[in-house]
């Protein structure tokens, strides 16, 4: 077999989390992105949950924010770069370019920020990984090929099984991740986009402060995205019993937990914190009406450094 040299060996990356909850005593800039959280839903929940306004009292809530794209794959690169994808180049080329040309990343680097990225779904290569202190090339091994077969068969069955059996073929991406053993890694823990895992790690470790360079952290969590595996208090439930509204409340519980940990640390006043989503929610197939199918209502809450208010600003 002859090749032109265009084929490249698959590279595995670890998005390390050892420093995820370690802040700088100088300055910090954190973007906490909660997938699929619709601002219309949060606005409705504000009346039912006055604790939202209390916990986010130092934030400004931009309830009329309009998102750029309706899906994560397009939205997140735009959020990080401000560069539209015009469909005039391969998407991987665009994904690489937005890192290299991002005014946000360029400014952060010029100002001496150490950058951490916790979003394994974005484009990455060995050249770009050096921009981020927590991304490393590692080896992965399966802990059990037998256990791997079950989610793999469900994945295959979702396409090839008869329609009535497809409902039995749902699976979670985490089912694969749980079977991976990371080798040759410089960090003991990896970033998790699963909300309850992120929250449990936060509650266990807390937020600490160190004498170090300024820090930028981009943290992308599953948020209110399907499957709906949480009740309103972030307890795990059968996804068939879950709803979007419950998932939205659960992800707000996690976001408030992060804010409170930060508030109780010495890093609160020197941290810019943006709590946002990549896009809104478009309803289920059983719903109808024009408003149901609009996904542009993205969540946006912003707290500046040394910013304090008596109640959340809207």
Segments predicted by a language model, with ranges:
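Catalytic domains that recognize anionic headgroups
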Residues: 1-314
């Amino acid at each position: 077999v002859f090749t032109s040299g265009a084929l490249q060996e698959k590279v595995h990356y670890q998005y390390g989390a050892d420093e995820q909850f370690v802040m700088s005593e100088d300055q910090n800039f954190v973007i906490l992105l909660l997938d699929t959280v619709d601002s219309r839903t949060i606005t409705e929940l504000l009346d039912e949950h006055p604790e939202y306004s209390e916990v986010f009292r130092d934030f400004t809530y931009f309830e009329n924010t309009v998102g750029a794209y309706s899906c994560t794959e397009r939205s997140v690169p735009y959020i990080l770069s401000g560069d539209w994808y015009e469909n005039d180049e391969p998407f991987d080329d665009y994904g690489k370019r937005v890192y290299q040309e991002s005014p946000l990343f360029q400014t952060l680097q010029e100002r001496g920020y150490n950058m951490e990225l916790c979003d394994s779904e974005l484009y990455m290569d060995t050249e770009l990984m050096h921009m981020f202190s927590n991304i490393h090339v590692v080896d992965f091994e399966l802990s059990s090929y037998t256990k791997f077969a079950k989610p793999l068969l469900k994945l295959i069955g979702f396409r090839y099984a008869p329609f009535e059996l497809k409902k039995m073929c749902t699976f979670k991406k985490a089912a694969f991740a749980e079977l991976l053993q990371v080798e040759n890694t410089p960090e003991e823990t990896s970033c998790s986009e699963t909300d309850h895992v992120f929250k449990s790690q936060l509650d266990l470790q807390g937020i600490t402060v160190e004498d170090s360079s300024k820090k930028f952290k981009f943290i992308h969590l599953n948020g209110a995205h399907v499957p709906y595996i949480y009740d309103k208090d972030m307890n795990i439930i059968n996804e068939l019993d879950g709803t979007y509204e419950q998932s939205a409340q659960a992800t707000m519980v996690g976001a408030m937990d992060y804010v409170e940990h930060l508030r109780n640390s010495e890093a609160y006043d020197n941290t810019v914190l943006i709590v946002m989503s990549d896009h809104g929610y478009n309803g289920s197939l059983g719903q109808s009406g024009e408003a149901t199918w609009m996904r542009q209502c993205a969540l946006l809450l912003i707290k500046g450094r040394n910013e304090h208010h008596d109640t959340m600003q809207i």
